[in-house]
């Protein structure tokens, strides 16, 4: 029974249920509970993936496409939760958590298996690790680009009211540029 996966799915759902109405109503009292629920989801997600990727014994690592996708979504969620805990990036959290919820559900409930032995080839392990980190970093940069385009569109069409929740466009652009640079460096190292 995938107990940790089910706990993570419930915790991601609770986080989404707290974040989405809070973003629409500009209410910030929900943030602490949303971060707590997201932290529980991340921990349970990590334990669920650990048991799926390392099934035990000398059988190797299960690096199926769904497990790797769920691992990437875990990395993205971890970074975005850390960013959100500093009162930034809240607009992207529903997208990130929904992505993680779907990936974890597919990885848990759909049978998939691709066993490999990375301990025999450390170069391949470094290559896969750097690839996963660069992929996660570039996805975060792409989400910042979507946020930048959405806010720019809303401002040009005079549909977005100014609030303290809306980050400045220049700071989003600067973050996006730095994150893209980090992703390109990681991809080059891969």
Where are these regions (language model features)?
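A mid-sequence, solvent-exposed acidic-amphipathic segment
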Residues: 154-190
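Loop-to-helix transition at the N-terminal end of transmembrane alpha-helices
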Residues: 27-44, 61-68
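Hydrophobic transmembrane alpha-helical segments in integral membrane proteins
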Residues: 1-15, 130-138
């Amino acid at each position: 029974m995938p107990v940790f996966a089910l706990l993570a799915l419930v915790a991601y759902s609770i986080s989404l249920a707290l974040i989405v109405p809070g973003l629409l109503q500009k209410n910030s009292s929900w943030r602490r509970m949303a971060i707590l629920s997201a932290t529980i989801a991340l921990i349970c997600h990590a334990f669920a993936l650990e048991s799926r990727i390392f099934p035990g014994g000398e059988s190797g690592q299960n690096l199926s496409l769904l497990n790797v996708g769920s691992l990437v979504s875990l990395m993205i969620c971890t970074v975005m939760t850390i960013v959100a805990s500093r009162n930034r990036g809240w607009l992207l959290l529903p997208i990130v958590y929904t992505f993680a919820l779907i990936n974890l559900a597919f990885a848990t409930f759909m049978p998939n298996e691709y066993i490999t032995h990375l301990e025999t080839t450390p170069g391949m392990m470094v290559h896969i690790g750097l690839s996963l980190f660069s992929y996660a970093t570039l996805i975060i940069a792409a989400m910042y680009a979507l946020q930048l385009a959405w806010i720019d569109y809303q401002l040009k069409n005079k549909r977005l009211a100014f609030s303290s929740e809306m980050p400045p466009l220049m700071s989003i652009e600067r973050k996006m540029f730095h994150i893209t640079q980090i992703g390109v460096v990681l991809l080059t190292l891969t």
